UniProtKB/Swiss-Prot annotation:
The keyword Nucleotide-binding does not apply. Keywords: Isomerase, Magnesium, Metal-binding, Phosphoprotein. It is an enzyme of class 5 (isomerase). This is Phosphoglucosamine mutase. Its cofactor is Mg(2+). One of its GO terms (molecular function) is phosphoglucosamine mutase activity. Its EC number is 5.4.2.10. The active site is at residue 99. Mg(2+) binds at residues 99, 242, 244, 246. The modification Phosphoserine is found at residue 99.
């Protein structure tokens, strides 16, 4: 049975993520990390979901039962766990979060001792241990060999200092008025402190988590409220984070949502202008707009494509010796400062770019026009191989003949089919998207 999806393990808390399942997974992961153990410590953080307490306690019980010492640091962004795992010299880090999903869901993400997400072969190794009954039941420790757990509440200061270090020393944010939407999630404490300490005039919304309101009509998936607040407050910029703050959505001074591919383009060129790129390559996923590739080429930069998911972006960056890349969804990686997408690092770099451009953000963050794209997330009931659907091959052939770029795939974390189409003719695009929706609804819903 496959346990891991495209971003760790995710499911409905109490249904897939039961205490027994989480304990079993925790033991399996712990036994895997034990093979390369240096410090016998594992770090655990979480977002603000109510079910986080249940998942955390199950993981602590599992890990201490096989002799691991556990450090619990409470609600923190996913990139903070990646950073602190390496900074505090832990064997591994665990983030309890379902990212942008509703509060009923939860998830578990693992990081190695260097703060990187696990590779697929590492996840498969954990799955093999998960299904090995004899190994699991022979691994419990007794007496003094049982591990301990302690909660540390002041590590937030390390991450805040790290974030401030990523911001150019010759700049401050005193000239910027900024609205932050923390999605009632993991960034609700960190984000306001960082921007205030760097001098910004800050307004914060959706920073009162109650365990059930994470991502609820707010944050990166629902930036309309942020857009309204930016216009009302006459702010220079607005930043919306998702539940675990590894994703960023930017709103300009006019209240417009800045497309993720435009962010990748303008930030890549900005990094080049500072001689901060380690290579002439920028990494993005196969969902990126063709206009991004053309814009980067005009600036003597090469776009490298990879599979969808920020861990694949990170792997592709390492392979190409690149230190900048991301997804149009808002997962953007500055690997000099973060091993995974970090919404706060990205927000600070966007702020620096706007300051140094001496332009309003609606101009500074609008470097090129995009080709028309349409993205639909279709709720489905089943996930058979797409190639097995009657008429699917003919459908793709027709799209190719019409020069419509297409990317059709199942979500790795939800029961959804993601359909992306891109073409120069917007009316044709809309017509074909409707045809595709009807085709897949008839066979998958």
């Amino acid at each position: 049975m496959k346990i891991f999806g495209t971003d760790g393990v995710r499911g409905k808390a109490g249904v897939k993520l039961t205490p027994m399942f989480v304990m079993r997974l925790g033991i399996a992961a712990g036994l895997y990390f034990k093979k390369h153990s240096q410090t016998n410590k594992i770090l655990i953080g979480k977002d603000t979901r109510k079910s986080g307490y249940m998942v955390e306690n199950a993981l602590v019980s599992a890990l201490t039962s096989i002799g691991y010492n556990v450090i619990q640091i409470g609600p923190m962004p996913t990139p903070a766990i990646a950073f602190l795992t390496e900074d505090m010299r832990c064997d591994a880090g665990i983030m309890i979060s379902a990212s942008h999903n509703p509060f009923e869901d939860n998830g578990i993400k693992f990081f190695n001792s260097y703060g990187y997400k696990l590779k697929e072969e590492e996840e498969r190794a954990i799955e093999e241990i998960f299904h090995d009954e004899e190994l699991l039941h022979s691994s419990y420790k007794v007496g003094e060999s049982v591990g301990s757990a302690k909660r540390i509440d002041d590590v937030i200061g390390r991450y805040i200092a790290h974030l401030k270090h990523s911001f150019p020393k010759h700049l401050n944010l005193q000239k910027l008025r900024i609205v932050l939407d923390t999605a009632n999630g993991a960034a609700y404490k960190v984000a306001p402190v960082v921007f205030s300490e760097l001098g910004a005039d800050v307004l914060v919304i959706n920073d009162e988590p109650n365990g059930c309101n994470i991502n609820e009509q707010c944050g990166a998936l629902h930036p309309n409220q942020l857009s309204q607040e930016v216009k009302k407050y006459r702010a220079d910029l607005g930043f919306a984070f998702d539940g675990d703050a590894d994703r960023l959505v930017v709103v300009d001074n006019l209240g417009n949502i800045v497309h993720g591919d435009k962010l990748l383009g303008v930030l890549g060129v900005y990094q080049k202008s500072k001689n901060a790129l380690s290579s002439q390559a920028v990494v993005a996923t196969s969902m990126s707009n063709l206009a991004l590739k053309e814009y980067l080429k005009s600036q003597d930069l090469e776009l490298k494509h990879c599979a969808i998911g920020d861990k694949f972006v990170s792997e592709c960056m390492r392979l190409n010796k690149a230190n900048f890349g991301g997804e149009q969804s808002g997962h953007i990686i500055f690997s000099d400062y973060a091993k995974t997408g970090d919404g706060l690092v990205c927000a600070l770099q966007v702020s620096a770019l706007v300051l140094e451009s001496k332009l309003v953000s609606s101009i500074a963050l609008n470097p090129f026009e995009l080709y028309p794209q349409s993205l639909v997330n279709l709720n489905i009931q089943k996930k058979p191989p797409l190639e097995s659907l009657k008429g699917y091959s003919a459908l793709l052939k027709e799209l190719d003949q019409l020069e419509i770029r297409h990317l059709i795939r199942y979500s790795g974390t939800e029961n959804k089919l993601r359909i992306l189409l891109e073409a120069k003719d917007e009316k044709l695009l809309e017509s074909k998207m409707q045809e595709l929706k009807e085709f897949f609804e008839g066979q998958l819903c």
